[in-house]
Swiss-Prot record:
One of its GO terms (cellular component) is mediator complex. Belongs to the Mediator complex subunit 7 family. This is Mediator of RNA polymerase II transcription subunit 7. It comes from Mus musculus. It is found in: Nucleus. Component of the Mediator complex, a coactivator involved in the regulated transcription of nearly all RNA polymerase II-dependent genes. Mediator functions as a bridge to convey information from gene-specific regulatory proteins to the basal RNA polymerase II transcription machinery. Mediator is recruited to promoters by direct interactions with regulatory proteins and serves as a scaffold for the assembly of a functional preinitiation complex with RNA polymerase II and the general transcription factors. The modification Phosphoserine is found at S195. Component of the Mediator complex, which is composed of MED1, MED4, MED6, MED7, MED8, MED9, MED10, MED11, MED12, MED13, MED13L, MED14, MED15, MED16, MED17, MED18, MED19, MED20, MED21, MED22, MED23, MED24, MED25, MED26, MED27, MED29, MED30, MED31, CCNC, CDK8 and CDC2L6/CDK11. The MED12, MED13, CCNC and CDK8 subunits form a distinct module termed the CDK8 module. Mediator containing the CDK8 module is less active than Mediator lacking this module in supporting transcriptional activation. The keyword Ligase does not apply. Residues 187-214 are annotated as: Disordered. Residues 203-214 have a biased composition (Basic and acidic residues). Keywords: Activator, Isopeptide bond, Nucleus, Phosphoprotein, Transcription, Transcription regulation, Ubl conjugation. There is a cross-link at K185 (Glycyl lysine isopeptide (Lys-Gly) (interchain with G-Cter in SUMO2)). One of its GO terms (biological process) is RNA polymerase II preinitiation complex assembly.
Length: 233
């Protein structure tokens, strides 16, 4: 008869799962599907649990004797349990020195085990409170970050407004308004018969050329102003 196969307590290497989820397997539909959701019961650390179990089960439902009353102060009970563990540990050391093979050694070990179970149970009852406090702290951090972001944005906005005001204050007084310089009035065409006269057409061309020269001069002034603003630190 062959030797029994040794089973490792550790999970298998993840590589044997990773190699199943290649791009080719996913495209061809050969990748393993995820396990279905558990509906009834499951095993964890060698114990069976139900999906509808309470997050913190009462001690009585686990077959454990309750050492503290139903209504109690968690801090006081934890201090009492801590002191009881210390005293029982010293008693266990005394038993191991005087009579290591005594039955009292097993009894004291069971007492210590029961005390530690109660300590862990009382600590676990603080988990919902811990979750609420963690959520509260996280929301406070997010609120503070948003307020700091809004404050920085407000400072940048005030700085931009100040820069614009300084630029406007540094403009020369003789600079024409940009609105008057950039806007070209659309004059209606004269449909009178006299508009076909050569002399009148020449006069219109001269006036339009004069206006064009004025617009070019204003555009050049604006370009110089923009270049000066860009050269400033």
């Amino acid at each position: 008869m062959g030797e029994p196969q040794q089973v490792s307590a550790l999970p298998p290497p993840p590589m044997q799962y990773i190699k199943e989820y290649t791009d080719e397997n996913i495209q061809e539909g050969l990748a393993p599907k995820p396990p279905p959701p558990i509906k009834d019961s499951y095993m964890m650390f060698g114990n069976q649990f139900q999906c509808d179990d309470l997050i913190i089960r009462p001690l009585e439902s686990q077959g454990i004797e309750r050492l503290h009353p139903m209504q109690f102060d968690h801090k006081k009970e934890l201090r009492k349990l801590n002191m009881s563990i210390l005293i029982n540990f010293l008693d266990l050391l005394d038993i191991l020195i005087r009579s290591p093979g005594s039955i009292k050694r097993e009894e004291k070990l069971e007492d210590l085990k029961l005390l530690f179970v109660h300590v862990h149970h009382l600590i676990n009852e603080y988990r919902p409170h811990q979750a609420r406090e963690t959520l509260r702290v996280m929301m406070e951090v997010q609120k503070r970050q948003r307020l700091e972001t809004a404050e920085r944005f407000q400072k940048h906005l005030e700085r931009v407004i100040e820069m614009i005001q300084n630029c406007l204050a540094s403009l020369p007084d003789d600079l024409p308004h940009s609105e008057a310089g950039m806007r070209v009035k659309a004059e209606p065409m004269d449909t009178d018969d006299n508009s076909n006269c050569p002399g009148q057409n020449e006069q219109q061309r001269e006036s339009s050329g004069h206006r064009r020269d004025q617009i070019i001069e204003k555009d050049a002034a604006l370009c110089v102003l923009i270049d000066e603003m860009n050269e400033r630190p």
